[in-house]
Amino acid sequence: MNGTEGPYFYIPMLNTTGVVRSPYEYPQYYLVNPAAYAVLGAYMFFLILVGFPINFLTLYVTIEHKKLRTPLNYILLNLAVADLFMVFGGFTTTIYTSMHGYFVLGRLGCNVEGFSATLGGEIALWSLVVLAIERWVVVCKPISNFRFGENHAIMGVAFTWFMAAACAVPPLFGWSRYIPEGMQCSCGIDYYTRAEGFNNESFVIYMFTCHFCIPLMVVFFCYGRLVCAVKEAAAAQQESETTQRAEREVTRMVIIMVVSFLVSWVPYASVAWYIFTHQGSEFGPLFMTIPAFFAKSSSIYNPMIYICMNKQFRHCMITTLCCGKNPFEEEEGASSTASKTEASSVSSSSVSPA
């Protein structure tokens, strides 16, 4: 083994010189230059500085404007709630620990930070699954006369939290565990050890199969069918140009959200799987730290995509920020009318396959 295993931690360094210490009790400056912890803290501060306002604004604007409270937007709001959960439960913890150079908050803090990051990431993934299924059902119409309504959206939100909890809760009760990883100032699932009594191997296989591979397969299937349906409908000109444009805009927005999720989380998942399948192999602290903290940036992607690509929401947001007036009223209003992306309009006038 090319690391040092201790009670509830694994340091990616052999303790041949006796410098390795518990990441709950001592600064880990022997792993990397102390300046790296300052950079990490600054990065987390940036994510908090951007992530909190943009996700809070998404929630506030939707509550402020009744016309935005559509079934599809319930799922998008669920993403914002998950991101805020990560900001408060994970980012604030990590910025504090990185300032000290070790996980000063102890085992309880490690569980809170690891749970928050895992739950937020899983809610985001399963929300994208629900969005993909919604797009597939609305556009491809595998169920005739089906309309995605408020009850379906509420069930979809409840489903995302249930599935996310099924992944994030078990390590709190002994099926695997959360331990410090990388530079030892953030926590994640124990991919590193075969510690007795925790069944890490079975949990990691369960997590990768049921909470990563299967949801991604569902997403790819739905969008594969959706792309074919949109092309067929466009060729047959079965729907009006306005309807087709609205469908394309909503679909494009959700696809970009999926791509941004993959860009954020696949590097982390790939490195975690490599470490799990090569336990005991040599790797440095940055090997896991960089993809782990890159994945955390996903908390600012989805609301930015939503704001940039949903013209109606952007119009309402500007109105809210400018005290009820939109200085770009003519441009935003015209665009919003021409290509409305409300779920209600999407559901009632959807593109069907030829």
Curated annotation (Swiss-Prot):
- Name the PROSITE patterns on file: G_PROTEIN_RECEP_F1_1, G_PROTEIN_RECEP_F1_2, OPSIN
The site annotation (Plays an important role in the conformation switch to the active conformation) covers E113
Keyword list (alphabetical) reads: Cell projection, Chromophore, Disulfide bond, G-protein coupled receptor, Glycoprotein, Lipoprotein, Membrane, Palmitate, Phosphoprotein, Photoreceptor protein, Receptor, Retinal protein, Sensory transduction, Transducer, Transmembrane, Transmembrane helix, Vision
What GO terms in the biological process aspect are recorded for it? absorption of visible light; G protein-coupled opsin signaling pathway; visual perception
Molecular function (GO) terms listed? 11-cis retinal binding; G protein-coupled photoreceptor activity
Task: List the ranges whose topology is Extracellular.
Answer: 1-36, 97-110, 174-202, 275-286
Recorded hits in SUPFAM superfamilies, A to Z, give: Family A G protein-coupled receptor-like
Q: List the disulfide bonds.
A: C110-C187
Q: Which residues lie on this side of the membrane: Cytoplasmic?
A: 62-73, 134-152, 225-252, 309-354
Lipid moiety (S-palmitoyl cysteine) attached at C322, C323
Transmembrane region(s): 37-61, 74-96, 111-133, 153-173, 203-224, 253-274, 287-308
Which parts of the sequence form the motif 'Ionic lock' involved in activated form stabilization?
134-136
Recorded GO CC terms: membrane; photoreceptor disc membrane; plasma membrane
Official protein name in the record:
Rhodopsin
N6-(retinylidene)lysine occurs at: K296
Please tell me the species this chain comes from. Atherina boyeri
Q: Cellular location of this protein?
A: Membrane; Cell projection, Cilium, Photoreceptor outer segment
Keyword field contains ATP-binding: no
